[in-house]
Amino acid sequence: MGAPLSTTRRGMGQNLSVPNPLGFLPDHQLDPLFRANSSSPDWDFNTNKDSWPMANKVGVGGYGPGFTPPHGGLLGWSPQAQGVLTTLPADPPPASTNRLSGRKPTQVSPPLRDTHPQAMQWNSTHFHQALLDPRVRALYFPAGGSSSGTQNPAPTIASLTSSISSKTGGPAMNMENITSGLLGPLRVLQAVCFLLTKILTIPQSLDSWWTSLNFLGGLPRCPGQNSQSPTSNHLPTSCPPTCPGYRWMCLRRFIIFLFILLLCLIFLLVLLDYQGMLPVCPLLPGSTTTSTGPCKTCTALAQGTSMFPSCCCSKPSDGNCTCIPIPSSWALGKYLWEWASARFSWLSLLVQFVQWCVGLSPTVWLLVIWMIWYWGPNLCSILSPFIPLLPIFCYLWVSI
C-alpha cells in the first residue's frame, strides 16, 4: 500500500514519522492514521491531494480569519469553506419616508405685506395717534409718564414677582461678585483649618522636646508593661490610655497648653499697649505709687474720637494737683519699667549696658550673627513648633 517507507527522505515535509493530522505542516495533508483514502493511505505521495501552493489561498472561513485548513475534506469545497471571500453589492439606501408617503417640501412663507397688509399700514403716525387714547397710553407709559424723553418701561408681572426692589431692565446680578463673595469665606475657613491642625501639633512637638531634655541620648522606648493591660513598646510621647505613662503625658501637655495661652496673653497685652489701648497712669518722679483721692482723675481726653484718656492727675505730698500725660504708646511697658527700676536699682545699669551695645552696633551684629550660626539649628528645632502662631500674631498686629 503506497510507496515503500524505506526510501530515505529529508526535511520536515519528507519525514513520515511526524504526525500531521490537519495538514498544517509543509507537504503533509492527513496522517495515514485517519485513512482518508483507502487506496493510498500514504498521503505524502497521494496524487489526489490538493497541492500545497493552493493551501496558501486561505481567508475567512469556519475557523475564523486566516484559520481555514488547506483542504476541503472537513468543511466542504464551497468558496466560504475554502476561505474565498465573495464581495456582494451593497443595497442602495432606502428612500426618504416623506418622499414615499407623498409629502412635499414645506413652501416658503409669503411675505408679511401679502399676508397681513393691515400691519404694514401701522406707521409712526398711526402709532402716535393711537397714543392719544388713554387706554392705549396706559399700556405703554406708567402713571405720570409722558411720551417724550427717557421713559421707564412698564412693569411686568415677572419683574414684580421675581424682585420687588429691582426694576425691569435693571442690570443683572454679577456672578463674579457672587462667586468671590462665596470663595472669600471658604479661603478663610481653609486657612483657619490649616493653622488649627498645625497648632494642634504644637503640644506633641513640645512634649517631644521636653522629654528629650531628660534623655540626651535620644528618646527611650516606653515598655508600657502593665499587669492589667500590657501594651507594646512605644515612645513616651505617644502613650496609649492603657499605659502607666499616659497620665504623665497628659500632665505635660496640659502645662504646655497653659504656656501657650500665657504666650498668647502676653502678645495680646503687648499689642494693646503698642496701640495705646492701655491708659496706665505713670509713676511720679521720686515716688513709687500715685496717691488716691478725688484729684486722681483724668482731666482731658485724647485728641479725636478716642475713648482713652490722655493724662492723669496725681496729688503729691505738697497738696497741689499735677497732671501727668499718659504716653500714647507703651504706657503699660513704661509703667512696669518705672516700677521695676524703683524696686531694683541695678536695672539702671542694664540701661547703660544696652546703650553701650547700641553704640557698638557693628560688633553687636557680628556677635548676633555668630550666635545664630552656632545655635541656629538648635534654636530652629526648638522654635519650629511655634511657627504656626506667627501668621496669627502678624495678622493681629496689622489688623488691630
Swiss-Prot record:
Region listing for Pre-S2, in residue ranges: 120-174
Region listing for Disordered, in residue ranges: 84-110
UniProt region (Pre-S1), positions on chain: 2-119
Domain of life, source organism: Viruses
Lipid attachment, kind N-myristoyl glycine: G2
Localisation: Virion membrane
Biotechnology: Systematic vaccination of individuals at risk of exposure to the virus has been the main method of controlling the morbidity and mortality associated with hepatitis B. The first hepatitis B vaccine was manufactured by the purification and inactivation of HBsAg obtained from the plasma of chronic hepatitis B virus carriers. The vaccine is now produced by recombinant DNA techniques and expression of the S isoform in yeast cells. The pre-S region do not seem to induce strong enough antigenic response.
Chief subcellular location: virion
Functional description taken from the UniProt entry: The large envelope protein exists in two topological conformations, one which is termed 'external' or Le-HBsAg and the other 'internal' or Li-HBsAg. In its external conformation the protein attaches the virus to cell receptors and thereby initiating infection. This interaction determines the species specificity and liver tropism. This attachment induces virion internalization predominantly through caveolin-mediated endocytosis. The large envelope protein also assures fusion between virion membrane and endosomal membrane. The middle envelope protein plays an important role in the budding of the virion. It is involved in the induction of budding in a nucleocapsid independent way. In this process the majority of envelope proteins bud to form subviral lipoprotein particles of 22 nm of diameter that do not contain a nucleocapsid.
Keywords noted in UniProt: Acetylation, Caveolin-mediated endocytosis of virus by host, Fusion of virus membrane with host endosomal membrane, Fusion of virus membrane with host membrane, Glycoprotein, Host-virus interaction, Lipoprotein, Membrane, Myristate, Transmembrane, Transmembrane helix, Viral attachment to host cell, Viral envelope protein, Viral penetration into host cytoplasm, Virion, Virus endocytosis by host, Virus entry into host cell
Positions of region (Pre-S): 2-174
Free-text description of this protein's post-translational modifications in UniProt: Isoform M is N-terminally acetylated by host at a ratio of 90%, and N-glycosylated by host at the pre-S2 region. Myristoylated.
Glycosylation sites: N320
Gene Ontology cellular component list: membrane; viral envelope; virion membrane
The name this protein goes by in its record: Large envelope protein
Domain notes: The large envelope protein is synthesized with the pre-S region at the cytosolic side of the endoplasmic reticulum and, hence will be within the virion after budding. Therefore the pre-S region is not N-glycosylated. Later a post-translational translocation of N-terminal pre-S and TM1 domains occur in about 50% of proteins at the virion surface. These molecules change their topology by an unknown mechanism, resulting in exposure of pre-S region at virion surface.
Any one Pfam family match given in the protein's UniProt record, by short name: vMSA
Gene coding for it: S
Chain segments annotated as transmembrane: 182-202, 254-274, 349-369, 376-398
Coiled coil regions in record: none
